[in-house]
Design a protein with these regions (language model features):
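Structural/interface elements that position substrates and couple domains in central-metabolism enzymes
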Residues: 1-448
Length: 448
């Protein structure tokens, strides 16, 4: 099939590239000329394992093109996917980019006769596709929905494994205006072997939010367990949660399958972040407030998450006898390993707390080269050893695998004081030199 992707951000470019690799002909459209030029050279504007190779192959084979001409792309395609951003504004998502994209696609539809399906890939609250998007398409095209197709097809891509997630999805959810729209999406995803849900537009929108809210809840639940373990002698959150994970309702017991993926969210740390979970939970709370529905559980999820980085700062200050004038090394800046995304990263919140307490910070992440939110207040040396040089303590804020293989003997010699606060329990089991004070998340004092 011929597919137009409107927006070349994370979702748009991964979706377009992967569809092209599955044999479809894809035109990615973006109004950012610099971004278009970068992608046309085969260079994704963000880090995602496997994407560069797939993109280069699709460009060379002519299965994927990138440009700014939306009308021409829509005129020559069967499906248009809206994959533009929906940033959060005080607990409400900003739909201006979605509405503008739908209006532009609508105008293009008004100039063609053939049936065309518009698919919303952007994460939007329930009721958006059949109101905001539909009305913009109808106004732009001068035609009613049904004359063109309309679907909501949420993405479930995890940064750091998005290509694999797209190619081997655990489910495909399609919300549709009518059966004809659904049939086109069924053809688009032919060959994908996974459960499919064909439902209403609003159910499809809500499935995405409900899924992300559950994951966020698991993280905050684990951090509440960790806080209690830290407050009581003899408790260890990692051991406690390992025992929880082994419940057969969470982990298969057939001897072949490993732990279910969901238990990876049942681990304590410095909190959740990124472009999805915080924004989506807040948007769900905002939608509920508009309808007069109380959300005490989701309110608590966000409150716990906001507190977590501050608690880590407090714990470190207690270990050092204060933070004013201290030099703190922070390892990890992205919100999770395997990505360069620092949006709403707990590591950034942690660093801001350290700076507010009077510490100076030098930070390292294997993929991150700049953190605009920190405004140049933090040194970003090119190697982890340089970040640790002269530090009073090191905080591990992101569980990057390479941190386990550092020469911790040499790192300890380079530090002024030898304190490690492992905010992700990433070094558990790693031999550390004598004389290091190693503090883990969720570990209480020794039992008397």
């Amino acid at each position: 099939m011929k597919v137009t992707i409107v927006g070349t951000g994370y979702v748009g470019l991964v979706t377009g590239t992967c569809l092209a690799s599955r044999g479809h002909r894809v035109a990615c459209v973006d109004s950012d000329a610099h971004r278009v030029a970068t992608i046309a050279r085969g260079a994704p504007p963000f880090h995602e394992p496997g994407l560069t190779e797939l993109l280069g192959s699709a460009l060379r084979d002519g299965r994927l093109t990138v440009g700014a001409a939306l009308e021409e792309a829509v005129a020559d395609s069967d499906v248009s996917m809206l994959a533009v951003g929906t940033p959060s504004r005080e607990g409400r998502i900003d739909l201006s980019a979605v509405e503008a994209a739908a209006t532009a696609v609508g105008r293009a539809l008004g100039r063609r006769e053939e049936y065309h399906v518009v698919v919303v890939k952007s994460t939007v609250v329930a009721g958006t596709t059949d109101t905001v998007v539909r009305r913009a398409l109808e106004a732009g095209s001068g035609r009613p929905a049904g004359a063109f197709g309309l679907c909501m097809n949420p993405e479930f891509l995890r940064e750091g494994s998005a290509v694999a997630d797209f190619m081997r999805p655990d489910r495909i959810v399609v919300g549709c205006w009518d059966a004809r729209s659904a049939a086109v999406l069924d053809e688009l995803y032919r060959g994908f072997d996974c459960p499919r849900i064909v439902t209403s537009l609003r159910n499809a929108e809500m499935i995405k939010y409900a899924a992300n809210a559950l994951l966020a809840t698991l993280v905050s639940y684990s951090n509440q367990v960790a806080a209690l373990c830290e407050a009581m002698p003899g408790l260890d959150e990692e051991t406690v949660m390992t025992g929880v994970h082994l419940d057969r309702r969470l982990t298969p017991v057939d001897g072949a399958a490993g732990p279910a993926g969901i238990v990876t969210y049942l681990r304590a740390g410095v909190g959740f972040g990124g472009s999805c979970l915080p924004k989506d939970v807040d948007a769900l709370r905002g939608l509920a407030a508009e309808r007069g529905v109380a959300t005490p559980l989701l309110d608590a999820v966000m409150a716990v998450n906001r507190q977590r980085a501050g608690q880590v700062v407090t714990n470190l200050g207690a270990a050092l006898g204060g933070l004013a004038g201290r030099v703190i090394a922070v390892l990890g800046l992205a919100f999770k390993p395997g990505t360069d995304d620092v949006r709403d990263s707990p590591a950034v919140a942690l660093i801001q707390g350290l700076l507010a307490a009077g510490a100076s910070v030098q930070a390292y992440d294997p993929l991150v080269r700049a953190v605009p939110a920190l405004g140049g207040q933090v040194a970003l040396p090119p190697a982890p050893e340089a970040a640790l040089a002269g530090a009073d303590a090191v905080v591990i804020a992101t569980a990057c695998p390479e941190f386990r293989s550092l020469d911790w003997q040499a790192c300890a010699r380079a530090m002024r004081q030898r304190v490690i606060l492992d905010g992700r329990n990433a070094l558990r089991g790693v031999p550390l030199p004598e004389g290091i004070t190693y503090l883990r998340i969720g570990l209480g004092a020794p039992a008397g």
